[in-house]
Structures are given as C-alpha cells and as structure tokens.
Design a protein with these regions (language model features):
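Basic/aromatic recognition patch in beta-strand/loop cores that engages polyanionic ligands
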Residues: 66, 141, 145, 167
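Residues that cap or flank secondary-structure elements
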Residues: 37, 139-140
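Short, well-structured N-terminal submotif of metal-dependent ribonuclease cores
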Residues: 1-62, 69-88, 155
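Histidine- and aromatic-rich ligand-binding microenvironments
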Residues: 19-20, 58-59, 140-143, 163, ...
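Alpha-helix capping/helix-boundary segments
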Residues: 23, 62, 147-148, 165-166
Length: 179
C-alpha cells in the first residue's frame, strides 16, 4: 500500500480518484464545519481535481453510505436536541418535518456530488472475489472498506479516505491519499 498525504500530493490529469464516504461527509455533510481543517483540505483537493480535469469516480455503495450516514447523523442531532434519546428512526423521526428537511438536503447534496464526479464506477460484483472479501472482514475492516479498496486496486485509482481502518487492509497496490 502506498500512502501519501495531501500536502505531498500533486493532482494530475492522468490520475483518477475515488472519495470515501467520510470525505464527502466532510465536504457536504451535517458535520461540515466541525472539523474545519479537514473540510478545507478535502474541499481544496476536490477543487484541484476538478481544475486539473482528473478523473473522479463514485460508486453506488458510496452514495448509499452517504445518504444513510447523513440521515442518521441528522437523526442523532434531532434526538439530542429534543431529548428523545430512545426515539426510533423509522417510526419517530421519519414522519417529522425535520426528517423531510434532512431528506431534501441530502438529495440536493447527492446531485452536487454526482455533478462533481466524472464517472460512475460500475460495481463489477459479478467479477469480484466475494469469498475473499468476506474472509477479509475483521475487527478493523468492514466489507464496504475492503470492497472499495479492491475496486481502487483493480482500477489503479487513488482512494481518498480519512478512515484509519483502511490501513489495516492487506494491500499491495492501493494508492491511499489522506490528510
């Protein structure tokens, strides 16, 4: 695994990138502003990628994770601000105007994310060694992390992530870009 830090990386038109869900959350999510330095650095990387016409790919898995995580963060904030610590996501939160607002926000953000990406990466589920992926799941790395690492390895793409678990995944050819 090749690990490079943002400060040492030069974006090139020849490079292709995949942003992990946590990167999109720093840039667009409801926690944006909480870690302003990371938000700024990853937003700058996004701008550089777009300015250099480098490839920026996204998968359906990342979009699904983004939508679900965004809405769960909003749910947690709603529970806390309303002191409804035992509230249920589906029966208590979904019928609320707050959920409707969060849903509207996340849909708009997904459109922004998709417009930033140059292509949608097919998942190639039919050609992946799923047994090997499942066998690789550990206390440090979940299925989604391993799956995205393998996809980036196969394509030779830079994987941009702020998830320290990624480094625990055995990899010979992954190009990991982080803050």
């Amino acid at each position: 695994m090749k690990i490079e830090h943002l400060s040492d990386h030069n974006v090139s038109q020849m490079n292709c990138y995949v942003f992990d869900t946590n990167i999109w959350l720093y840039i667009y999510g409801p926690m944006a502003g909480i870690q302003a330095r990371k938000q700024r650095n990853y937003s700058n990387l996004l701008r550089e990628i777009l300015d250099h016409n480098a490839g920026l790919f996204i998968t359906s898995l990342i979009l699904s994770e983004y939508i679900n995580r965004f809405l769960r963060i909003c749910f947690d904030q709603w529970k806390s601000s309303n002191k409804l610590y035992n509230a249920d996501y589906k029966s208590d939160y979904r019928p609320t105007p707050e959920f409707a607002n969060s849903l509207s926000d996340v849909k708009a953000q997904v459109h922004d994310i998709l417009s930033s990406c140059t292509a949608r990466m097919p998942d190639d589920f039919h050609s992946m060694d799923i047994d090997s992926l499942v066998d690789s799941i550990s206390q440090q790395a979940d299925y989604n992390d391993i799956y995205l690492v393998r996809r980036c390895e196969r394509k030779g793409f830079w994987f941009v992530s702020d998830d320290t678990d990624i480094e625990s995944i055995p990899s010979g050819s992954l190009q990991l870009l982080k803050e």
